[in-house]
Amino acid sequence: MAEYTASFGLTAFEYQCGRGVRLGLDKAAALKEAFDAKGITFSVHAPYYISMSSLEEDKRLNSVNYLLQSCALVKALGGRRVIFHAGSCGKQSREAALEKALDTMRRAVQAVDEAGYGDCILCPETMGKVNQLGTLDEVLALCSVDERIIPCVDFGHLYARSQGTELNDETAPADYAAILDAIAAALPGERAKKFHAHFSRIAY
């Protein structure tokens, strides 16, 4: 897998744990060795079960545990970044959902530090469905909780969220500039230069 990834000239690999963190630490160590030899850095996508804005507290607490599991794995793989979806708004307002997510984010940062994973970088991701918590502004709000948090900007998701009215062939240059300007304004300094990014081939 490392050789195949390197054959494309890639230097980063995002290990998917959407259905749960199931990779054993022994296998992770073997992957780390193989990918290190090719100069490829790992990140981990945390489980899709995360719901930082849930109305149910146990689901919010479980979300923190999923992030801890993901941090343990990414460290075993020799990486630092953990990407995750914050969750949906459900039957509450966006404002209420964001407040719950911010509270869960604070708990997550504390738990990550207490578990010894303070060097891990949590990366909330922009989302494509309108009812999901994940506009660029919402993601940047989550990043305000701690200076170690950086955004995962999924440009395909932002395009889908706008139903193709943004980041299309006509508007892309101005839209990309606006996104980068917003990140720079919210995260001054080096953090804005190191945001995580996803690109997907989506067309409306």
Kindly give the residue locations of the regions a language model identified.
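Active-site acidic/histidine proton-transfer and metal-coordination neighborhood
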Residues: 53-153, 160
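Hydrophobic faces of well-ordered beta-strands that scaffold small-molecule active sites
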Residues: 13-15, 42-46, 82-84, 122-124, ...
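A general structural motif
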Residues: 10, 37-41, 79, 117-119, ...
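Short amphipathic alpha-helices and their capping/turn segments at secondary-structure boundaries
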Residues: 2-3, 24-38, 68-75, 135-147, ...
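Histidine-acidic metal/acid-base catalytic patches
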Residues: 140, 145-155, 159-204
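Active-site beta-loop-alpha junctions enriched in small/polar residues
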Residues: 16-20, 47-51, 87-89, 125-129, ...
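N-terminal pre-domain/capping segments
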Residues: 1-46, 50-71
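A structural signal for the main folded, soluble domain(s) of proteins
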Residues: 3-5, 38, 99, 111-121, ...
